Every structure is written in structure tokens, then in C-alpha cells.
């Protein structure tokens, strides 16, 4: 989903390097609704999406009205979001969402009251013999298809792309470029927040505010996914699966012979080769 977030921004002429921060706010929104409000999973997902969208809209606002580069503001908001969420969860070890024994947020799967916030698996866990395989992957694919339809088959999508290609021409055509810049970043942020909700509501992991002193890798992996897919929303489905297989596979390598960082090296080489292919295609 962070790959789709970055790809969407690319398609509308913006560089959303703030997907990590938007992902962080989305994670907090999903976990807060699940743990504190005991809401069902679909409500938690909506809140995660809204928070991610708000966090993405702020750099968009600065870009639209003050012409401040979205890369600078989104990088700043990455770190603001990270430390804000860590403090809200940890609260000096007394936070109601924080499990002191495990130094993480409360496990949604350990309580019948909290487990209703988990995304249903419809037998996928039994099929794949895991405890975190849910319908999240199908929801993500459906959203990717929806984004493709919006960008390529609707007037709204055409306006967003037109503003990205040429703001002045879009303005002369009667398109409100400021509104569309903010909307583009808000939608990109919402996609990243939605992805965080899918991840944490599938109970893949719990948030650790003590270890979370670096930004979630998913936010930056999204850049690789978007580049590999050439910013095609449908392509992000397959490039995300490919990149995630490399990343997860690296963690299972024998450290006696290979460092786990070799997976990052492979991903980096792939991205460089993708960039070279675009260069050669442009010359041809």
C-alpha cells in the first residue's frame, strides 16, 4: 500500500517521500480504535485511512499555498509523526495501549474483546498454516484496481494528472490546482495509512515504541515498489509481492555465509536497472 501511495503521488506530479510518517499515523489510528475504543476492524481501517490522509494533506497544503517542496515537509513530518506516536503509546511506560511485559502495544489476538478488531481470515490461516494471513491482501489489490480506475477512467483522475503535468495549463483550463495538489497528497497519505491498518489489524506485529526510533521500512520500500512498477497502480500489486519476497527471504538467510543486508543490495540493484531501462527507453 505504501508503494501504491508513492505511485499515486508520482502519477499526479508529486513525490510522496512521507509515506513512512503517514503509515505511522495510520498504525496509531488503527491500534487506538482497536485497543481503546474496541471498535470492529473495518472502523479501525477507516480511522487509519483518515489519519494517514490528514498527515499527507499537510505537506500538500504547504506545497499548494506556499510552494514549499513536498519532499522537505514530508521528511520533517515523518519524524514528527514517529516520535508523536511513540510518545502517545508509551507515555513513560504507563500508556493504556502499552504492554509493559512485552514492551509493545497490546496483542489483539490475546483477548476475545480485542480480537474483533482483527481482519478476518476466512480460512486463509489454515490454508497457509500461518496466524496472520487475512483478506488484507485482497483488500489491498482491490484498492489498487480502484486507484487505476480513478486515474485512468474518471474526470477527477484526469484533473489530478493534469495539475501534475503542468499547473499553469491546468489553471487556464479552469482546474483548481491548489485543491488538487492537497487532494493528491491526502489520497496518497490515506493509502499509506490504510496499509498500516491492514498490517497491524492482521496481527502480524505489535508496535514497539522503544525500538521504533527509525522510520518503518515499509514507507521507503514503497518507493522501490512504485519505481519497479513504473507508478502503475496495477503493477504495484506484483512489484510489492516481489520486493516483499526479497525482503522476507533475506531474513531467513544463513548469517554464517551471507549478511541479511544482501536482500537490500538486491533490491537496490533492481531499482537501478529499472532506472536505466527508463533512460534507454527515453533515448530510443
What do the predicted segments below correspond to?
Residues 165, 172-179, 250-284:
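Cytosolic-side transmembrane-helix boundaries in multi-pass membrane proteins
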Residues 18, 41, 122-136, 254-264:
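Interfacial loop-to-helix junctions that mark the boundaries of transmembrane helices
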Residues 19-27, 44-52, 70, 74-78, ...:
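Alpha-helical transmembrane segments of multi-pass membrane proteins, especially transporters
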Residues 1-36, 49, 53-57, 61-68, ...:
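Single transmembrane alpha-helix segments in multi-pass membrane proteins
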Residues 191-193, 202-268:
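Transmembrane alpha-helical segments in multi-pass inner-membrane proteins
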Residues 78-153:
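Transmembrane helix-bundle core of multi-pass membrane transporters
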Residues 2-6, 54, 121, 128-206, ...:
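Helix-loop-helix "hairpin" substructures at the membrane interface of multi-pass membrane proteins
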Residues 1-6, 27, 31, 49-54, ...:
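Hydrophobic core segments of alpha-helical transmembrane domains in multi-pass membrane transport
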Amino acid at each position: 500500500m505504501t508503494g501504491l501511495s508513492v505511485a499515486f503521488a508520482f502519477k499526479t506530479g508529486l513525490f510522496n517521500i512521507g509515506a513512512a510518517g503517514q503509515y505511522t499515523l495510520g498504525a496509531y489510528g488503527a491500534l487506538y480504535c482497536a485497543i481503546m475504543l474496541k471498535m470492529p476492524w473495518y472502523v479501525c481501517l477507516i480511522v487509519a485511512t483518515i489519519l494517514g490522509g490528514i498527515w499527507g494533506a499537510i505537506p500538500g497544503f504547504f506545497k499548494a499555498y506556499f510552494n514549499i517542496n513536498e519532499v522537505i515537509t514530508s521528511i520533517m513530518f515523518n519524524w514528527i509523526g514517529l516520535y508523536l506516536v511513540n510518545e502517545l503509546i508509551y507515555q513513560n511506560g504507563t500508556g493504556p495501549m502499552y504492554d509493559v511485559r512485552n514492551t509493545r502495544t497490546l496483542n489483539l489476538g490475546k483477548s476475545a474483546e480485542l480480537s474483533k478488531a482483527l481482519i478476518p481470515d476466512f480460512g486463509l490461516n489454515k490454508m497457509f498454516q500461518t496466524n496472520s494471513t487475512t483478506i488484507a491482501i485482497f483488500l489491498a489489490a482491490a484498492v489498487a484496481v480502484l486507484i487505476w480506475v480513478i486515474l485512468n477512467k474518471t474526470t477527477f483522475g484526469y484533473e489530478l494528472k493534469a495539475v501534475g503535468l503542468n499547473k499553469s495549463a491546468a489553471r487556464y483550463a479552469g482546474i483548481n490546482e491548489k485543491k488538487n495538489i492537497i487532494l493528491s497528497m491526502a489520497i496518497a497519505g490515506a493509502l499509506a495509512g490504510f496499509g498500516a491498518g491492514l498490517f497491524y489489524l492482521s496481527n502480524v506485529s505489535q508496535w514497539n515504541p522503544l525500538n521504533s526510533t527509525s522510520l518503518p521500512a515499509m514507507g521507503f520500500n514503497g518507493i522501490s515498489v512504485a519505481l519497479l512498477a513504473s507508478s502503475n497502480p496495477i503493477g504495484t500489486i506484483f512489484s510489492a509481492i516481489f520486493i516483499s519476497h526479497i525482503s522476507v527471504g533475506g531474513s531467513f538467510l544463513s548469517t554464517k555465509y551471507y549478511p541479511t543486508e544482501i536482500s537490500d543490495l538486491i533490491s537496490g540493484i533492481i531499482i537501478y536497472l529499472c532506472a536505466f531501462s527508463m533512460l534507454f527507453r527515453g533515448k530510443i
